[in-house]
Regions:
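Active-site helix of classical SDR
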Residues: 122, 158
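Substrate-binding pocket helix/loop in short-chain dehydrogenase/reductase
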Residues: 98-99, 106-111, 137
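Residue(s) in the substrate-gating loop at a strand-loop-helix junction
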Residues: 142
Length: 162
């Protein structure tokens, strides 16, 4: 990645506890951005906070499936730091099961976290980004969205939706 100065920029990275999300959060923080990374629970959020503390970043708990959760989180971030400049929609879960055995709840949970949370988060930051005439929304998908795997119809559908 090129070394771009992101000093003064505010970034939210959902699903920042490990993997791609952690790497993105760390990279944005190292480039000077104030990064808020999310995890599903308090212990994960604390670990993100410890990791990002050297760059003045924070970890926050977020249940991406909850309708009010993402809107409330973004409102809190904007009160504390100002309007977001960067949103990385990375939160994602799997509930693998063959479609013929899949419960509707397994389908719905994946859609809520992996797809609908992207809509909610993006909608919540758009007004501020448009008002400041700048901002970036980055949606992390998967190759599984283009070419599914057995037992992942729900995950493939959500990632293809991005």
């Amino acid at each position: 990645m090129s070394s771009q100065d992101l000093s003064g920029k505010i970034a939210l990275v959902t699903g920042a506890s490990r993997g791609i999300g952690a790497a993105i959060a760390d990279t944005l923080a190292q480039a000077g951005s104030t990064v808020i990374g999310t995890a599903t629970g308090d212990s994960g959020a604390a670990a993100i906070g410890e990791r990002l503390a050297q760059w003045n970043g924070q970890g926050r708990a977020l249940n991406a499936a909850e309708a009010d959760g993402i809107e409330n989180l973004i409102a809190d971030i904007e009160k504390e730091f100002g309007k977001l400049d960067i949103l990385v929609n990375n939160a994602g879960i799997t509930r693998d099961n063959l479609l013929m055995r899949m419960k509707e709840e397994e389908w719905d949970e994946i859609m809520q976290v992996n797809l609908k949370s992207v809509f909610r988060a993006s909608k919540a930051v758009l007004r501020g980004m448009m008002k400041q005439r700048s901002g970036r929304i980055i949606n992390i998908t998967s190759v599984v969205g283009a070419m599914g795997n057995a037992g992942q119809a729900n995950y493939a559908a959500a990632k293809a939706g991005l």
